A protein has these predicted regions:
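Positively charged n-region of N-terminal signal peptides that target proteins for export
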Residues: 1-4
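Extracellular carbohydrate recognition and processing domains
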Residues: 470-506
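Glycan-processing catalytic domains of CAZymes
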Residues: 25-412
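Short carbohydrate-recognition loop motifs
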Residues: 414-435
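Extra-cytoplasmic beta-strand recognition segments
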Residues: 431-462, 494-498, 502, 526-527
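Short beta-strand-plus-loop segments that form exposed binding edges in beta-rich domains
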Residues: 511-519
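Exposed low-complexity, polar/acidic, P/S/T/G-rich flexible segments that act as propeptides
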Residues: 520-537
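Bacterial N-terminal signal peptides
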Residues: 8-19
Length: 537
């Protein structure tokens, strides 16, 4: 063990500590990462079929799905999916009323509580921007969908603006439309028209779009343009104008989630995800009307999408084939998911397209998607990595229990630090301790756990051997500041989980501890485990 650890005491001048104050910030209010499964399976099944498989979602890493609601058209007797609002007949409250109990039961499940109701897909046949009747019908349908979502306790709606019908591009200006400036005004009007109904019914709705403002604007590189209107004119692009209409209608209490679908091309995880998240709030505003910029900054959230096919394809010449990282394709996924989870505001979404992968093992009487594989079937270790990245602190005891059950749990720190430590010369009031794990490998996951009494502050950081730990690199959420109520002995438990970034040449993990000089202040029961290494899968 001597080559693994170095326990030393240092001057306060060289250490950084984080103390978490609980006053005014109850843990239940903390924003946690939410993973949404966006595969085509859920969009081609019904709300009832999702509910029939809810138990499988409860056991999964996911928190929700977009739910495709199927209703009966009373005029034709045929079933329609409500999200085709521009193609379909009007969806009324009466048509969707019997789906409210189904939706309510769906979101009562742990693995589905963050689900959305699918509310808009681009039309199969392009609708003229001047067609008042069709847009008014679509707006009424959106209102009915939002009212059902609100009544069922669903967080919000899913909005898909991707052009699935290349010859019918709704958000591209065409010959026969009014001149571009007039059509841009109409597009903004239609965006407001549709979403005014949504927010009137559900003022705090979360509107999730795989392609939000940022995605569209980075695709066409408008950020450097001194005249965004002119830039959109040159590209015949009406989407930013429609999105401004959504902002016109949105209350300040709403959330507009930019799914950043192009994030599946972010392979330099720390840099690209961080830059993209900043762009959602900062640079995306350059494509927003001045009167909406403050609202845009307040209601916009950065999210990131994962195209899982890229991690399991065997054809190395395929457009989306991601090479291994440190010899592991799971390691590549872990690195990307870590970046997305660190820098998303709230949501990360995952999907598959061509590899016959679904979020769970479906069991449907119809047989649809039965027998398809899950990501963990195709990329062993996927589930473990997903649980670790979504909520490292919750994952820690689960992973420790798994390792113990398999006989593979080893406490790398075999003896106590000491129940009571005395103050050092450097500070008569506090004692500062540092523990370094010196032979860690890039991509590995480690977990610390100890008990503390009295005034104890602590933090885990990664760094490079011989260098100070990077100020950028606080790689645990939350810190390991002791939390929870004291036990019978007056001790509280502290847990910290750290993942070593893949670009470190000589990584070390540093646990920094500060103890009050009071005789009863101290730490004991110290545990350190190597939790996961993607290279072992």
């Amino acid at each position: 063990m001597k080559e693994l650890f170095c326990l030393s005491f240092a001057s306060a001048a060289f250490l950084a500590f984080v103390a978490v104050a609980n006053d005014g910030f109850p843990s239940s209010d903390c924003v946690r990462r939410k993973y949404i499964w966006f595969g085509w399976d859920t969009q081609n099944l019904s709300a009832e079929q999702v509910l029939d498989n809810a138990a499988s979602f409860d056991e999964s890493v996911y928190d929700g799905v977009p739910v495709s609601v199927v209703v009966r058209n009373p005029e034709t007797g045929k079933d329609i999916r409500v999200h085709h609002v521009l193609d379909n007949p009007e969806v009324t409250d009466a048509m969707i009323a019997d789906k409210i109990p189904v939706l309510k039961e769906i979101v009562s499940h742990r693995g589905l509580r963050e689900s959305f109701v699918s509310s808009f897909y681009t039309p199969k046949t392009r609708v003229p921007w001047t067609d008042d009747a069709t847009w008014a019908k679509a707006a009424r349908s959106m209102g009915a969908i939002a009212r059902a979502a609100k009544s069922a306790g669903v967080k919000g709606v899913f909005f898909d603006r991707e052009e699935y019908h290349p010859t019918e591009k709704q958000f591209e200006w065409r010959e026969g439309d009014p001149d571009f400036e007039a059509c841009a005004r109409l597009a903004r009007q239609r965006g407001a028209q549709l979403f005014r109904e949504v927010f009137r019914a559900h003022p705090t709705a979360v509107v999730f779009s795989c392609y939000g403002m940022l995605t569209a604007c980075t695709t066409f590189d408008y950020f450097g343009s001194p005249d965004v209107m002119d830039a959109t004119r040159q590209k015949h692009d009406l989407w930013p104008h429609f999105y401004n209409g959504i902002l016109d209608a949105a209350p300040w209490e709403a959330k507009l989630v930019d799914g950043t679908e192009v994030a599946y091309e972010y392979l330099q995880s720390r840099e690209e995800y961080a830059k993209s998240a900043a762009c959602v709030k900062v640079r995306g505003g350059s494509c927003v009307a001045p009167e909406n910029r403050n609202k845009y900054a307040a209601v916009s959230q950065a999210s990131f999408g994962f195209f899982l096919d890229a991690y399991v394809k065997t054809n190395k010449t395929a457009r989306y084939w991601y090479e291994p990282l440190n010899g592991s394709r799971l390691g590549r996924f872990d690195d990307n998911l870590w970046g997305a989870s660190q820098w998303s505001d709230e949501y990360v979404w995952l999907y598959a397209a061509s590899q016959r992968m679904t979020g769970i093992h479906w069991r449907n009487k119809s047989g649809h998607f039965n027998g398809w594989t899950t990501p963990d079937d195709r990329l062993p270790g996927y589930d473990e990595i997903a649980f670790a990245n979504k909520d490292p602190i919750a994952w820690f005891p689960r992973r420790v229990a798994e390792l113990a059950a398999s006989g593979n749990l080893t406490n790398l720190f075999a003896k106590d630090i000491g129940e009571v430590l005395k103050p050092t010369k450097e500070d008569a009031r506090r004692l500062f301790g540092v523990i370094e794990v010196q032979n860690a490998k890039a991509g590995e996951w480690y977990g610390f756990r100890f008990r503390a009494c009295g005034d104890v502050q602590s933090i885990v950081r990664w760094g490079e051997k011989g260098l100070r730990s990077r100020p950028y690199g606080a790689s645990i959420l939350p810190s390991v500041t002791p939390m929870g109520r004291p036990d019978a002995d007056g001790r509280r438990q502290a847990i910290g989980v750290v993942r070593i970034p893949n670009d470190l040449q000589s990584p070390v993990i540093v646990l920094k501890v500060a103890l009050d000089s009071h005789p009863k202040a101290g730490i004991d029961g110290f545990e350190l485990y190597r939790l996961f290494d993607p290279r072992e899968y």
